[in-house]
Amino acid sequence: MVFVYFWRVLTVTKLSILHWQDIPTVVEGKDKQGVQKVELSKRFSELVDMVAKRKGLVGTDEYLENWKKRRLPSSDKSAKQGVKDLVEDFEKRFDEIKTKALSSLR
């Protein structure tokens, strides 16, 4: 009995999000085509600054410690498409993200 295996080349994309606390700021995707990196709109970085100032964290080690890179499960989309989809989702959900971030100030 002869077994023949066919290997399909899959696009395996590694996606990650740079965020400060729960506020995303940069989305990155890596696949065999290279790296795609997109910074979210300015309102996200402005939100980080506002929350950090209100918490008195600007210029402190604690501010720096709140920056994290979260890796997402691998995707079969291209890096370009995966990043585009995540960026669109975050931009649509900005008000929700802002509300959550500001509620942490209470």
Predicted features and spans:
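Acidic, low-complexity intrinsically disordered segments
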Residues: 59-106
